[in-house]
């Protein structure tokens, strides 16, 4: 960045904004880079502004019971704000004085006032000086409030971010991500945009009072007729505005529906193509678009009438003000022109300035109140620690995630004690306790000495993560004691990577120690991964580490925790994404050796981890099921596997199903009907069994902490309701059985217990901030970020950036301390930061874009021609009247004086004929604005153009190859369908209409003035040329600055979301100050771009006005010096010239707006022009009897006989397959060759990132591939993509459930009847799940099927494949994150429904590979081995190294057969425990 010229600018340079000329010159000559932007001043830095406001806010909190944020803002910014308001008022006063001088000039040409003729030139000078003074006052008065608004936004941005880092986890659960982003973007932007208008709330009434006083002097009481009309008009416009808001609110819901489906489509575009759902998704979205456009047109029509009302109102205001006075007393022409000028100013004040100011204050105060309530939310409280403590002790700890429950717990306990209830009534307290909701942890006690390893195990939802949160202080205990030193390091279950280098992610602000760093890298198995990068550990990682595999992210997160020198290490399931071999090595070298003398708490379910732990804590339903050593566990709890795995009471509400992991913890006990408990003397807490998504969560972020909340309660078995019995009374074999019988399969499968009306798009619960932090690893690794080999895509809630400035800020981390960040930002870093965000769109919209836009719809050309014809007709009428006036003027010359002397009659001389002509021009202007036959067709047609462009872009994206889509960000694609389509629908049609309307008004007025005074035309030509050149000069720079500003806005929100994802990690490491500094850096960079844009815009606006002032001076003196007796001509000229001033400036601004909005059109065209996937010939489908497509596919191919059904057997032959993610990228698979027999099951083996999932994508032709694949003798080059992909059934890692009914999700094309769908649902074990929802198959799923578990979603994919009658099934780690019961259901379905199909399985679990006949081992992107299990186990191979001796025995055929012999119950229990727990990851 460069030093700002503003620092050394003179007072005149600041007044005229001349200091911006260097950047304007550079932007005109070349493309601007971030390095060209100027540094901000210290007064605009986020550090200073936030410190200033934070100091005043703290003062407000300390001094008052009811603190007001507006008081803190007032003390910071009020006096400067009022100073600019006074300047603005003085500028507006000059507008009221100008008509007085105009009236005196017109009066000086009256034949009866020849004495004043000599002072006309001085009056003209005075009028010109007023325009000059107004120009000098107005622009600083507008720029100042904009600047103050920017500073207020920066200060409140920082205050909100700091508060976010301090919020308690309970509060974070109540705030949705959308609400938080909206609080920062939508609300705070109001200060930037509207603060300049805020002063008109008091300026406009004063101005109206002054103007009415002057009009009273001219017209007396009749002046109030015009004012009354303006008030009525303002009320009419308010009514139109209310109607428009009604349509927009209705439309917003429809837009939300469309964008939900569109975002799901974009996020899962790979699955859409794999399922061949392009046409179905396109039809679904287009249907929603049709409904949306109906409301769009209504809103546009209302807004059009609202805009037109302003223009035609001028004529009626003048008529209503002048006509009563003229009829009663007669009127002089001087008064008419003066009244016209007054009414123009009065109309602006009443119908525009005052309503806008009121709206600005309403929005701003509403935003301030929202922020004020947010700043008073409950904060995270740091626990008190004893640094000398060497042990970790927890005594009888109970905790609730819901804040109010802890208080209720204490109150209920006190009530029981006061009543002195007997032992037989002790259940009373626990009955009330269950009504309050289940505590997440109950009566937990343990003690571990320094250097010991505590293994924490339990089923899903048992409270393992909550235990760690309580140790960290994120969860406050309701009762009990926690004791440790406070020096904690934490590794989250969900890998969190901050933008920056690998080294910075591991060091994370801790002092750098070379030996320790290298030891940690080695222990976490990162040496090999780092060596593959050219920059080694200095490679910059994007937000979320999207360029890394899940295993790499997990190891970096673990390395960060281990690198910190702490007393206590909390490791929350750190091995979830690691293959067996890597996990084993890291556990031995890192957890057991490197940290041997440290206290460790490890959340795990691996048997070998439990064996090596010093102490074991098994949690079940939040209670301590067991605490002790492993030997004690075997002897005391022989059934511990059922609690560890959750076989008996598996909680189906897994992480994917929960909208918030905290609120879901409460849904454990069932209440029949309503129940209530004592809250206090006046309040009752009601617990109603409502649907989880039955009621929309309020949009306001202000959910009171103590407010009454409704939540769903899940029904549980009697075993769970009655406590934690050691024996449920069931036979032991039944409780440990994993594989259900066919007839009982659905009964054993855990059911969903959410009973509610089908959720709608509007009714869905928003994702909470805490859910973002506790998102499952599936969602974290796959749902939002999809890894590619050489490119990245990401989905975000806000405007997108790639590696963002935060990457650069993180690089500034000092080796000694993370708080010292360099102020300088390297130009190379900036280019790297934004390399993917700089659009390849010209800085100024090309004429080709305009031409292409106009020709999208043929009707648009005819509408534009019609507009031109109407305008030419109006101009012709004006010129005819003008010619008649010139011909009649000499004949009426003798009557002029006579008519003028009659003061009681309306003048009817040739002079008044000019007045009649001017009225005609006014009528023409009104017709021009009102013209239904021109304006409405234009707006209607432009919306139709938007409809066509959306349809073409949607089709293009769906048909684009994945190699192209892999180079784009998902957020960028979504912005085209949201932001750019909104521009085409809302802003562009009316902006184009306004521009055409204003341009024609200016041309007509200039034509009239030029005909009256031809000399004025000579002055008009250079002015128009100057306007065109100045506009072109400014546009080159302004559009680039706007683009840079947009790019600079993304890192602010990216950093916010990144901080929220890793908030627990930040707090554990104490890195909040460092991240606050990074946030301020992001704010400062955005401020530099935004302030420069505001300054250059003001430079341009001031130059426009200066040019016009020169033009007006020329017009004034030409009129005064060349006009003879008769006041009509000079009155028309000067009045029109004053009107041209504002209209022409408005027209130029509209042209800039059109050019800016047309960039959205350019971006849409860029997407429309994307290449389509190759479509081969020779495709046909056999029609069924009812005319629909057949369920089987008929291939016309030289290798297959006519009418043969393909595929028939599922034989696959792969020859020399090479795959790339993007064109020109590195090969991710090389020379893969093998063959699969029909019906064979093949397992894919390899370490994380070896290319197993990539191979499955290559089979579906979702990558750039070379080589050949044949299925049943048919080559993939000889048939279409659709035909090829329909041969495969797919169960991906990331399951695609779009917002729609069960029926639509299973059969989007509507090819199958209900009977067939129910049959398949029963086969895969889904029928009982679907039947419990209202509407059954018509139940609407939202949020990716959040009411379903991950297992249910996998079954949905399985059902799709069964319906599609696929002969080849591709499974990409289907057992990842599944509960054991659902996994066994999937295994059973695979055996039955796909018994004669070819199955290709990618898995980490050894158990999942039991039924594979052959194994394909992939290493370093190549096939290393392809053989049977016996051969692989008999030689040295990656597969042999990856499994334990016990697993090898399990995989051998004789071992499998020997397992069938009868065993005693205890022996069976012990062996099954070791086998199942060994490979289960929770």
Curated annotation (Swiss-Prot):
User: Where are the Cytoplasmic topological domains?
Assistant: 1-77, 147-195, 244-298, 359-859, 941-991, 1036-1096, 1153-1482
Compositional bias, Acidic residues, is annotated for 1472-1482
Q: Which domain of life is it from?
A: Eukaryota
Q: Cross-referenced InterPro entries, in alphabetical order?
A: AAA+_ATPase, ABC1_TM_dom, ABC1_TM_sf, ABC_transporter-like_ATP-bd, ABC_transporter-like_CS, ABC_transporter_C-like, CFTR/ABCC7, CFTR1_ATP-bd_dom1
Query: Where does it reside?
Result: Apical cell membrane; Early endosome membrane; Cell membrane; Recycling endosome membrane
Q: Kindly state the subunit structure of this protein.
A: Monomer; does not require oligomerization for channel activity. May form oligomers in the membrane. Interacts with SLC26A3, SLC26A6 and NHERF1. Interacts with SHANK2. Interacts with MYO6. Interacts (via C-terminus) with GOPC (via PDZ domain); this promotes CFTR internalization and thereby decreases channel activity. Interacts with SLC4A7 through NHERF1. Found in a complex with MYO5B and RAB11A. Interacts with ANO1. Interacts with SLC26A8. Interacts with AHCYL1; the interaction increases CFTR activity. Interacts with CSE1L.
The text the record gives for the protein's domains is: Binds and hydrolyzes ATP via the two cytoplasmic ABC transporter nucleotide-binding domains. The two ATP-binding domains interact with each other, forming a head-to-tail dimer. Normal ATPase activity requires interaction between the two domains. The first ABC transporter nucleotide-binding domain has no ATPase activity by itself.
Indicate where the modification Phosphothreonine is found in the sequence. Answer: 717
Species name: Sus scrofa (Pig)
Glycosylated sites:
895, 901
As recorded in Swiss-Prot or TrEMBL, the protein's gene is named: CFTR
PTM info: N-glycosylated.
Give the GO molecular function terms: ABC-type transporter activity; ATP binding; ATP hydrolysis activity; ATPase-coupled transmembrane transporter activity; bicarbonate transmembrane transporter activity; chloride channel activity; chloride channel inhibitor activity; chloride transmembrane transporter activity
The stretches that face the Extracellular side, renumbered to this chain, are 99-122, 217-222, 320-339, 881-919, 1013-1014, 1118-1131
Protein name, please? Cystic fibrosis transmembrane conductance regulator
Pfam families the record matches: ABC_membrane (PF00664), ABC_tran (PF00005), CFTR_R (PF14396)
Gene Ontology terms describing biological process: bicarbonate transport; cellular response to cAMP; cellular response to forskolin; chloride transmembrane transport; intracellular pH elevation; membrane hyperpolarization; multicellular organismal-level water homeostasis; response to endoplasmic reticulum stress
């Amino acid at each position: 960045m460069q030093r700002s010229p503003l620092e050394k600018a003179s007072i005149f340079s600041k007044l005229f904004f001349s200091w911006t000329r260097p950047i304007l010159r550079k932007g005109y000559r070349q493309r601007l880079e971030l390095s060209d932007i100027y540094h901000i001043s210290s007064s605009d830095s986020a550090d200073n502004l936030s410190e200033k406001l934070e100091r005043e806010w703290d003062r407000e909190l300390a001094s008052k019971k009811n603190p007001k944020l507006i008081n803190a803002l007032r003390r910071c910014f009020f006096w400067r704000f009022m100073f600019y308001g006074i300047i603005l008022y003085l500028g507006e006063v000059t507008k009221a004085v100008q008509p007085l001088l105009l009236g005196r000039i017109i009066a000086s040409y009256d034949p009866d006032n020849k004495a004043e003729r000599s002072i006309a030139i001085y009056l003209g000078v005075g009028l010109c000086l007023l325009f000059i003074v107004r120009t000098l006052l107005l622009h600083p008065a507008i720029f100042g409030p904009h600047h103050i608004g920017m500073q207020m936004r920066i200060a409140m941005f920082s205050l909100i971010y700091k508060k976010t880092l301090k919020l308690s986890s309970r509060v974070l659960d109540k705030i949705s991500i959308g609400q938080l982003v909206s609080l920062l973007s939508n609300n705070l932007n109001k200060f930037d945009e509207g603060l300049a208008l805020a002063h008109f709330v008091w300026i406009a009434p004063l101005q109206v009072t002054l103007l009415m006083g002057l009009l009273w002097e001219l017209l007396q009481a009749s002046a109030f007729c015009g004012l009354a009309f303006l008030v009525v008009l303002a009320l009419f416009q308010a009514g139109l505005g209310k109607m428009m808001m009604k349509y927009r609110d209705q439309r917003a819901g429809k837009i939300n529906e469309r964008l939900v489906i569109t975002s799901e489509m974009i996020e899962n575009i790979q699955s859409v193509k794999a399922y061949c759902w392009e046409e179905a998704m396109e039809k679904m979205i287009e249907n929603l678009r049709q409904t949306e456009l109906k409301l769009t047109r209504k809103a546009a029509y209302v807004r059009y009438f609202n805009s037109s009302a302003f223009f035609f109102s001028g004529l009626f205001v003048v008529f209503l003000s002048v006509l009563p006075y003229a009829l009663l007393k007669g009127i002089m022409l001087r008064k008419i022109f003066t009244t016209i000028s007054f009414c123009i100013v009065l109309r602006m004040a009443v119908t525009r300035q005052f309503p806008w100011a009121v709206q600005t204050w309403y929005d701003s105060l509403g935003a301030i109140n929202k922020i004020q309530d947010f700043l008073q939310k409950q904060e995270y409280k740091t626990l008190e620690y004893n640094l000398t403590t060497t042990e970790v002790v927890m005594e009888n700890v109970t905790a609730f995630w819901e804040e109010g429950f802890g208080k209720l717990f204490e109150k209920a306990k006190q009530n029981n004690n006061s009543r002195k209830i007997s032992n037989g009534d002790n259940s009373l307290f626990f009955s009330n306790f269950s009504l309050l909701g289940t505590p997440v942890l109950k009566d937990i006690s343990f003690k571990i000495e320094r250097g010991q390893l505590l293994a924490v195990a339990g089923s899903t939802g048992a409270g393992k993560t909550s235990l760690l949160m309580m140790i960290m202080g994120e969860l406050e205990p309701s009762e009990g004691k926690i004791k440790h030193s406070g020096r904690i390091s934490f590794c989250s279950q969900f890998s969190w990577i901050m933008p920056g280098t690998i080294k910075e992610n591991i060091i994370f602000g801790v002092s750098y120690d070379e030996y320790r760093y290298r030891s940690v890298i080695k222990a976490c198995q990162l040496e090999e991964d780092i060596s593959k990068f050219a920059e080694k550990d200095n490679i910059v990682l994007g937000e979320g580490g999207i360029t890394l595999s899940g295993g790499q992210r997990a190891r970096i997160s673990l390395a960060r925790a281990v690198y910190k020198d702490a007393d206590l290490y909390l490791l929350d399931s750190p091995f979830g994404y690691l293959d067996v071999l890597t996990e084993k090595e890291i556990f031995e070298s890192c957890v057991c050796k490197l940290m041997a003398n440290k206290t460790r708490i490890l959340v795990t379910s691996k048997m070998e981890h439990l064996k090596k732990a010093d102490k074991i804590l098994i949690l079940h339903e939040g209670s301590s099921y067991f605490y002790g050593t492993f030997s004690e566990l075997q002897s005391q709890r022989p059934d511990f596997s059922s609690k560890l795995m959750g076989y008996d009471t598996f909680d189906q509400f897994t992480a994917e199903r929960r909208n918030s992991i905290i609120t879901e913890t409460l849904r454990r006990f069932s209440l029949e009907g309503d129940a209530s408990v004592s809250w206090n003397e006046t309040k009752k807490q009601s617990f109603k069994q409502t649907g989880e998504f039955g009621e929309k969560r309020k949009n306001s972020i202000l959910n009171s902490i103590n407010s009454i909340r409704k939540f769903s309660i899940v029904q549980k078995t009697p075993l769970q309701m009655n406590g934690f019995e050691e024996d449920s009374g069931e036979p032991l074999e039944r409780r440990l059985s994993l594989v259900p019988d066919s007839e009982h399969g659905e009964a054993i499968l855990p059911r969903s217990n959410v009973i509610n009306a089908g959720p709608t798009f509007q009714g869905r619960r928003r994702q909470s901030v805490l859910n973002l932090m506790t998102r499952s690893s599936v969602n974290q690794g796959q749902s939002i970020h999809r890894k590619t080999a050489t490119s990245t895509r990401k989905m975000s809630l806000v405007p997108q950036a790639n590696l963002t400035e935060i990457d650069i800020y993180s690089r500034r981390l000092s080796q000694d301390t993370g708080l010292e960040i360099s102020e300088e930002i390297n130009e190379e870093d900036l280019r790297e930061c934004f390399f993917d965000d700089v659009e390849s769109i010209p800085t100024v919209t090309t004429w080709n874009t305009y031409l292409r836009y106009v020709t999208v719809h043929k009707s648009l050309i005819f509408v534009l021609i019609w507009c031109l014809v109407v305008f030419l007709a109006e101009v012709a009428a004006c010129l005819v009247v003008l010619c008649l006036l010139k011909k009649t003027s000499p004949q009426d010359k003798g009557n002029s004086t006579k008519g003028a002397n009659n003061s009681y009659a309306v003048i009817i001389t040739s002079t008044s004929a000019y007045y009649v002509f001017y009225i005609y021009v006014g009528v023409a202007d009104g017709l021009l604005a009102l013209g239904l036959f021109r304006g409405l067709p234009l707006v209607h047609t432009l919306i139709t153009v938007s409809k066509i462009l959306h349809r073409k872009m949607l089709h293009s994206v769906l048909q684009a190859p994945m190699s192209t889509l892999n180079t784009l960000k998902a957020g960028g694609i979504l912005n085209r369908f949201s932001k750019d389509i909104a521009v085409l629908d809302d802003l562009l049609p009316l902006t184009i209409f306004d521009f055409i309307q204003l341009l024609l008004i200016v041309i007509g007025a200039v034509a009239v003035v030029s005909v009256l005074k031809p000399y004025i035309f000579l002055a008009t030509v250079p002015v128009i040329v100057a306007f065109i050149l100045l506009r072109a000069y400014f546009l080159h720079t302004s559009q680039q600055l706007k683009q840079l500003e947009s790019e600079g806005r993304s890192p602010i929100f990216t950093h916010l979301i990144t901080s929220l994802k890793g908030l627990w990690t930040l707090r554990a490491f104490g890195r909040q100050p460092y991240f606050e500094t990074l946030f301020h850096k992001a704010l400062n960079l955005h401020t530099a771009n935004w302030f420069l844009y505001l300054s250059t815009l003001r430079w341009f606006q001031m130059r426009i006005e200066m040019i016009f002032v020169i033009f007006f001076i020329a017009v004034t003196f030409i009129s005064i010096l060349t006009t003879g007796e008769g006041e009509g001509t000079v009155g028309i000229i000067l009045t029109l010239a004053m009107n041209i001033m504002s209209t022409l400036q408005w027209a130029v601004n509209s042209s800039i707006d059109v050019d800016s909005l047309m960039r959205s059109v350019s971006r849409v065209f860029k997407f429309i022009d994307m290449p389509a996937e190759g479509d081969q010939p020779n495709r046909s489908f056999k029609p069924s009897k009812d005319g629909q497509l057949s369920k089987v596919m008929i291939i016309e191919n030289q290798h297959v006989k006519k009418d043969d059904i393909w595929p028939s057997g599922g034989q696959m032959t792969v020859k020399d397959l090479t795959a790339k993610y993007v064109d020109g990228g590195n090969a991710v698979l090389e020379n893969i060759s093998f063959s699969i027999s029909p019906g064979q099951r093949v397992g894919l083996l390899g370490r994380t990132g070896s290319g197993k999932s990539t191979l499955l994508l290559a089979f579906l032709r979702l990558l750039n591939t070379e080589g050949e694949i044949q299925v049943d003798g048919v080559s993939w080059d000889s048939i279409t993509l659709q035909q090829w992909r329909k041969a495969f059934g797919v169960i991906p890692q990331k399951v695609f459930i779009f917002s729609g009914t069960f029926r639509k999700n299973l059969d989007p094309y509507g090819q199958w009847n209900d009977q067939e769908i129910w049959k398949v649902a029963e086969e895969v074990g889904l029928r009982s799940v679907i039947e419990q929802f209202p509407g059954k198959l018509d139940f609407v799923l939202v949020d990716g099927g959040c009411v379903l578990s991950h297992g249910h979603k996998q079954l949905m994919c399985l059902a799709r494949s069964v319906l599609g009658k696929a002969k080849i099934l591709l499974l990409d780690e289907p057992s990842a994150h599944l509960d054991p019961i659902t996994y066994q259901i999937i295994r059973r379905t695979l055996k039955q429904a796909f018994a004669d199909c070819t199955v290709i399985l990618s898995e980490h679990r050894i158990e999942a590979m039991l039924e594979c006949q052959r194994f394909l081992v992939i290493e370093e992107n190549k096939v290393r081995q392809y053989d049977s299990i016996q051969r692989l186990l008999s030689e040295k191979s990656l597969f042999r190294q990856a499994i334990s001796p016990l697993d090898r025995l399990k995989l051998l055929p004789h071992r499998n057969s020997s397992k069938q012999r009868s065993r005693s119950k205890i022996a069976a229990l012990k062996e099954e425990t070791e086998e199942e727990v060994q490979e289960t990851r929770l």
